[in-house]
């Protein structure tokens, strides 16, 4: 079940932020910025330690007021020798609301600009990992909301510096456990540093037993000592060098997002698309609906969709006006009275933030829909619609991405320095250090020896005449959806399983029967809507979705084939999942901290189907 995040309650004691829950202050009464710089940055040898590095990773055990992050970000900005990319991972059980951060940060005018940017990107307070891109993506904040031990266990990263913060050991015993120090040792890069304000014996002992060489330093202000440490233990095997050139096969949202994430990490990308332009398949629909999922058990699909949805809200805004989308809200009506009762009870138990999802009664549902709908439902105020093609074009608009269209890939050939991509006649199309298969069902054909249970499901959307439903200003769903659009409302979508057509065929010609099914969906959502137009005024568009039995995507390294990766099986959640999964795959390929929990990454990895491997 979803664990509710309880925000911190802001109090001040003598002008210093104070936690009544822990009976401790958030920083020294002698000055917060000075403490951050002396104890944590200087304690970890920063900024000198990151000089000339391509990337540098900091992990903090308590985000608190965000002071250490702001001080580190400011130091990175001010340093001409700064690394190209700064990752800052921080865990927090009780995060502040953005408005409270504004009150706290007002004490530190030197961070005013950074604070405003941070608060403008502050995530909804929901459990899990939240990847926040700042400074054009050169600074990556991964905010992990939840219990520290659980969050840190899910981190996949190689850490260069640890900020051990999070209230005094005798006030926050849940954090300062032996497991914490074991986790630090597992995550530490060779020679990683650590710093903390405390010199308590259990902390010194825990660090020492985990392989850190510790030393006391002069403390800050009235505190006599603080502590620094350097990891001298045994590290995990070093990560292979990141590829310089990656070929991405497939120009839909999965491939476009992966290509952009890779090029943003300094990798040269060639994208091969078999059609005449990107976004010609399912990614070519006039609009697509984006919204989160809710489930009582908070399963993998729910957690992945939540993380991806929240990431989209920030990332799409950063792409600018070239992305056509609207946070108009999605009203999802209950199917029947029994379903309504279950959904209302579930929402009450989960206690989600109202701006994420809330229950609305029949009267409010009718107000939101501007229609006499027949059921109450769940309202997702931050959700809405997006034009998938505009997303693809925005992601691919980068000089480091070489787009090649009309390139049908026949097979892949492993070569000494990577991979060769061949057409169906055996002619070379490209060579690359690594390859990403983002070509839906066809990924199975190119990944020799794999037997992923990818299959296609045909889906058709139906375009209504322009002006036929002028009242509809937001997406309304109920076993289907109707969405506003520039060319007229769009109704969708059919989910046609193989019993209705040949398994894995490529028939995308519109079908009258599919339009009829969509119009029946429309009538169930908006009673009387089909009387606004005649049926021969509608038009259909069909495409094929690649899906898997567990309804999760297929993202990660292909087992036994070094340098080969896959991003497929996004089904009907492609626009929601693609951005964050592209980031995750690019981080995996380049050896950077992952933006998702390790358990989620395992849940979407190709290795989960290892037992299905083909034999010769």
UniProtKB/Swiss-Prot annotation:
InterPro entries: FAD-dep_OxRdtase, FAD/NAD-bd_sf, MnmC-like_methylTransf, SAM-dependent_MTases_sf, tRNA_MAMT_biosynth_bifunc_MnmC, tRNA_MNMC2, tRNA_S-uridine_synth_MnmC_C
Alphabetically ordered keywords of this record: Cytoplasm, FAD, Flavoprotein, Methyltransferase, Multifunctional enzyme, Oxidoreductase, S-adenosyl-L-methionine, Transferase, tRNA processing
Subcellular location: Cytoplasm
PANTHER family xrefs: SARCOSINE DEHYDROGENASE-RELATED, TRNA 5-METHYLAMINOMETHYL-2-THIOURIDINE BIOSYNTHESIS BIFUNCTIONAL PROTEIN MNMC
Name of the protein described by the UniProt record: tRNA 5-methylaminomethyl-2-thiouridine biosynthesis bifunctional protein MnmC
Known EC number: 2.1.1.61, 1.5.-.-
Region entry FAD-dependent cmnm(5)s(2)U34 oxidoreductase, spans: 249-616
Role: Catalyzes the last two steps in the biosynthesis of 5-methylaminomethyl-2-thiouridine (mnm(5)s(2)U) at the wobble position (U34) in tRNA. Catalyzes the FAD-dependent demodification of cmnm(5)s(2)U34 to nm(5)s(2)U34, followed by the transfer of a methyl group from S-adenosyl-L-methionine to nm(5)s(2)U34, to form mnm(5)s(2)U34.
Main location group: cytoplasm
């Amino acid at each position: 079940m979803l664990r509710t995040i309880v925000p911190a309650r802001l109090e001040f004691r003598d002008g210093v932020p104070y936690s009544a829950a822990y009976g401790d202050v958030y920083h020294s009464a002698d000055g917060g910025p000075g403490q951050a710089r002396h104890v944590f940055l200087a304690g970890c040898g920063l900024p000198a330690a990151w000089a000339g590095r391509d990337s540098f990773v900091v992990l903090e055990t308590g985000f608190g007021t965000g002071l250490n992050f702001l001080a580190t970000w400011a130091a990175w900005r001010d340093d001409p020798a700064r690394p190209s990319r700064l990752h800052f991972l921080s865990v927090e059980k009780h995060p502040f609301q953005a408005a409270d951060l504004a009150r706290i940060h007002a004490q530190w005018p030197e961070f005013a600009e950074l604070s405003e940017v941070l608060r403008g990107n502050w995530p909804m307070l929901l459990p899990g990992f939240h990847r926040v891109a700042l400074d054009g993506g050169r600074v990556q904040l991964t905010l992990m909301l939840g219990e520290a031990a659980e969050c840190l266990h899910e981190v996949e990263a190689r850490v260069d510096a640890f900020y051990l913060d999070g209230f005094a050991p005798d006030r926050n015993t849940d954090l300062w456990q032996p497991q914490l120090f074991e986790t630090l040792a597992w995550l530490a890069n060779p020679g990683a540093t650590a710093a903390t304000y405390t010199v308590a014996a259990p902390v010194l002992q825990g660090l020492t037993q985990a392989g850190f060489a510790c030393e006391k330093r002069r403390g800050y202000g009235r505190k006599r000592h603080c502590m620094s440490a350097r990891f001298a233990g045994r590290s995990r095997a070093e990560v292979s060098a990141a590829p310089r050139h990656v070929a991405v096969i497939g120009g839909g949202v999965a491939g476009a997002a992966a290509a952009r994430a890779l090029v943003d990490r300094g990798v040269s990308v060639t994208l091969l698309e078999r059609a005449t332009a990107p976004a010609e398949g399912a990614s070519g629909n006039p609009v697509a609906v984006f919204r989160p999922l809710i489930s009582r058990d908070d399963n993998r699909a729910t957690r992945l969709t939540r993380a991806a949805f929240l990431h989209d809200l920030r990332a799409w805004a950063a792409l600018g006006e070239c992305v056509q989308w609207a946070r108009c809200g999605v009203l999802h009506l209950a199917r029947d009275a029994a379903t309504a009762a279950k959904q209302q009870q579930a929402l009450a138990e989960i206690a989600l933030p109202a701006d994420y999802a809330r229950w609305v009664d029949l009267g409010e549902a009718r107000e939101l829909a501007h229609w006499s709908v027949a059921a109450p439902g769940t309202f997702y105020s931050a959700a809405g619609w997006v034009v998938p093609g505009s997303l693809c074009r925005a992601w691919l608009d980068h000089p480091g991405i070489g787009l090649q269209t009309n390139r049908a890939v026949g097979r892949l050939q492993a070569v000494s320095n990577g991979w060769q991509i061949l057409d169906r006649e055996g002619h070379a199309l490209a060579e690359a250090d690594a390859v990403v298969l983002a070509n839906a069902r066809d990924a199975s054909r190119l990944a020799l020896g794999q037997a992923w249970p990818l299959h296609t499901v045909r889906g058709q959307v139906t375009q209504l005449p322009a002006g036929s439903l002028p009242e509809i200003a937001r997406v309304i769903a109920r076993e289907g959806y109707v969405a506003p659009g520039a060319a007229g409302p769009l109704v969708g979508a059919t989910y046609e399983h193989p019993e209705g057509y040949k398994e894995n065929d490529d028939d995308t010609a519109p079908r009258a029967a599919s339009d009829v099914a969509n119009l029946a969906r429309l009538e169930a959502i908006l009673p009387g809507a089909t009387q606004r137009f005649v049926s021969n005024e509608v038009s259909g568009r069909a495409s094929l979705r690649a899906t898997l039995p567990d309804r999760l995507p297929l993202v990660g390294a292909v087992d036994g084939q070094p340098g080969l990766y896959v991003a497929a099986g996004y089904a009907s959640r492609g626009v929601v999942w693609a951005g964050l999964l592209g980031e995750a795959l690019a981080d995996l390929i380049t050896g950077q901290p992952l933006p998702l929990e390790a358990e989620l990454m395992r849940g979407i990895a190709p290795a989960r189907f290892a037992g299905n491997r083909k034999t010769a």
